[in-house]
Curated annotation (Swiss-Prot):
Subcellular location: Cytoplasm
Coiled-coil residues: none
Protein name as catalogued: Uridylate kinase
Stated family: Belongs to the UMP kinase family.
GO BP, sorted A to Z: 'de novo' CTP biosynthetic process; UDP biosynthetic process
Enzyme class: transferase
Gene3D superfamilies in alphabetical order: Acetylglutamate kinase-like (3.40.1160.10)
Source superkingdom: Archaea
InterPro entries assigned: AceGlu_kinase-like_sf (IPR036393), Asp/Glu/Uridylate_kinase (IPR001048), Uridylate_kinase (IPR011817), Uridylate_kinase_arch/spir (IPR011818)
Amino acid sequence: MKVVVSIGGSVLAPDLDADRVADYADAIQSLDAQGHTLGTVVGGGPTARDYIGSARDLGANEIELDQLGIAVTRLNGRLLIAALDDRAAPTPAESYDEGREAIRRGDIPVLGGIVAAQTTDAVAAAFAEYVGADLLVYATSVPGVYNADPNEDDDATRFDELGADELVDVIADIEMDAGSSAPVDLLAAKIIQRSGIRTMVLDGTDPERVVRAVEDGEFDGSEILPEA
């Protein structure tokens, strides 16, 4: 099975912990050893937010802030590449073409951000569509998709399953509420809707959950199903 795994920066590198990165590399290598074709996308997490906040205070514009965030995602990507050793492409892919070429060579590509004004959520969805992935997995700090931001609304309820059309509606509603955040952004949701790729959103703080989700289809989170 061809699988793209999106690893949130808050999951992979909330701080510099080599053991956490090594555990994620072990999970990716385990899936690779089972014969799956893999691509990975890594987010920026709190480090990116810290840099962006400081740069904003210094007067950087939004495109400059995006470029700074992209640079941090690629630093996180290099940590994962170091842990994956010779199974990974040697540097983070800076385009979808580079990522696909790595897969064709038999390497595991690691992508961070690609272009300004696009999150790594959207990069993962677009890359999954580009390479014809069978499954897209978002390993996040939130255990699934909720009907509201669970950090803002104590009554938020999680979807075990939802269609891609419903995902777009839910994310659009959440993003309209100031201060709220969703496990994937609206552009990513729309790409998932367009592509028809089966998608899982799960709590990725334990990388073994990603392995079980891919191998057994067993996970505690939300599954987004293609529309008929």
